[in-house]
């Protein structure tokens, strides 16, 4: 392992990535050049994908990059085979609306904190890991972990034996529509006609739902039902590290899971040892 046990995590990150000559300071370009011919095209593509958490449709990728046809198909396939990206359907399962999302943590971290870092500060991460931007990074990372543990989410909800379809949903208002755009990064549609709108929220303590956020959740659920034509059975599920705090506005939560559900297999093995 490159991690040094006598160092804290921020110290290790600085030593590996931000220190000049660090073992991973040049890893990004070396990695892409080692894996792909015409690596610059792949880097341009993943850089675009890094700018939108929910991902891009192929049409959006073509319009922005100018890549198209078989060469774009090959690039998207190669990136997914190497686990840099994931593709998933939008609710309704229309293949033309497939979303391509950047899922590699190192690539995401590179574009967010390394590529444009001109500070030349060998202790950059120690000086900035408590910044607000890192809080949003923690939230994004937690969402990505949740999406990679979908079978555990189903298991925690007690629906492992029920046929389901997992997708994303987003609403983009047309010109003249005053409603705001919104999205749900994980929608689980069950064969028994229950639909889970899954909220994945990072918090070091039990997550507290405010009055404003409760209203936002209600509005989003109503919009989802209106746009999809689903009349009933749409419920809100939360996945958080430590659960949802019981309060005045928590009744909107139909079901909730915590980190222990995402890592149930590991915890069981640890206990058995």
Range-by-range predicted roles:
Residues 18-42:
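Short alpha-helical segments that sit at the start of domains
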Residues 45, 57-64:
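A short acidic, leucine-rich amphipathic alpha-helix
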Residues 37-54:
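Short amphipathic alpha-helical interface segments
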Residues 1-26:
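Amphipathic alpha-helical "lid/sensor" segments that cap RecA-like P-loop NTPase cores
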Residues 80-91:
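A short, conserved structural fragment
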Residues 91, 98-273:
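A cross-kingdom feature that marks ATP-driven nucleic-acid transaction machinery
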Residues 65-82:
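Short amphipathic alpha-helical interaction segments
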């Amino acid at each position: 392992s490159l991690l040094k046990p006598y160092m804290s995590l921020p110290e290790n990150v600085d030593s590996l990535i931000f220190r000049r000559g660090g073992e991973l300071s040049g890893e990004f370009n070396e990695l892409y050049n080692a894996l792909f011919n015409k690596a610059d095209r792949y880097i341009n593509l993943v850089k675009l994908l890094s700018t939108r958490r929910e991902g891009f449709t192929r049409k959006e990728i073509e319009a922005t990059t100018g890549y198209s046809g078989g060469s774009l198909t090959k690039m998207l396939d190669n990136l997914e085979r190497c686990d840099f990206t994931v593709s998933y359907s939008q609710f309704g399962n229309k293949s033309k609306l497939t979303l391509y999302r950047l899922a590699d943590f190192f690539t995401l971290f590179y574009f967010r904190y390394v590529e444009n870092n001109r500070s030349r500060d060998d202790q950059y991460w120690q000086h900035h890991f408590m910044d607000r931007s890192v809080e949003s990074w923690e939230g994004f990372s937690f969402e990505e972990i949740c999406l990679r543990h979908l079978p555990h989410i189903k298991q925690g909800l007690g629906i492992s034996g029920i046929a389901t379809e997992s997708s994303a949903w987003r609403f983009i208002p047309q010109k003249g529509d005053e409603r705001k755009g919104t999205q749900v990064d994980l929608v689980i549609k069950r064969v028994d006609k229950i639909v889970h709108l899954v909220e994945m929220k990072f918090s070091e303590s039990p997550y507290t739902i405010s009055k404003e956020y409760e209203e936002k959740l209600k509005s989003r659920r109503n919009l989802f039902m209106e746009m999809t034509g689903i009349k009933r059975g749409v419920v809100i599920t939360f996945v958080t590290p430590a659960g949802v705090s019981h309060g005045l506005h928590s009744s909107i939560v139909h079901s909730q899971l915590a980190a222990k559900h995402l890592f149930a297999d590991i915890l069981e093995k640890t206990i058995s040892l």
